[in-house]
Curated annotation (Swiss-Prot):
Note: Negative results: does not induce chromatin fragmentation (apoptosis) in T24 and HeLa cells.
Disulfide bonds: 3-26, 17-23, 22-47, 35-54
Keyword Secreted: yes
Residues spanned by motif Cell attachment site: 39-41
Protein name: Disintegrin rubistatin
Compartments (UniProt record): Secreted
Tissues in which the UniProt entry reports expression: Expressed by the venom gland.
PANTHER family for this protein: ADAM A DISINTEGRIN AND METALLOPROTEASE DOMAIN (PTHR11905), DISINTEGRIN AND METALLOPROTEINASE DOMAIN-CONTAINING PROTEIN 28 (PTHR11905:SF32)
Keywords per UniProt: Cell adhesion impairing toxin, Disulfide bond, Hemostasis impairing toxin, Platelet aggregation inhibiting toxin, Secreted, Toxin
Family annotation (InterPro entries): Disintegrin_CS (IPR018358), Disintegrin_dom (IPR001762), Disintegrin_dom_sf (IPR036436)
An annotated Gene Ontology molecular function: toxin activity
Domain named Disintegrin: residues: 1-61
Gene Ontology CC: one annotated term: extracellular region
Lineage: Eukaryota, Metazoa, Chordata, Craniata, Vertebrata
Length: 61
């Protein structure tokens, strides 16, 4: 993984994340970036800009 130093098992300097739907090239994706398209309505899940996780929009749990 280019975001981690294999020798130390730690993140490389400047890396914010190593994986996740809201992680792109070791950085958190911008707030509002669609990370999961809704198949039911138009309330797509979007990145927060603060995490690599893709939070649910909360409407359907």
């Amino acid at each position: 993984n280019p975001c981690c130093d294999a020798a130390t098992c730690k993140m490389r300097p400047g890396s914010q994340c190593a994986e996740g739907l809201c992680c792109d090239q070791c950085r958190f994706m911008k707030k509002g970036t669609v990370c999961r398209v809704s198949m039911v309505d138009r309330n797509d899940d979007t990145c927060t800009g603060l995490s690599a996780d893709c939070p649910r929009n909360g409407l359907y749990g």
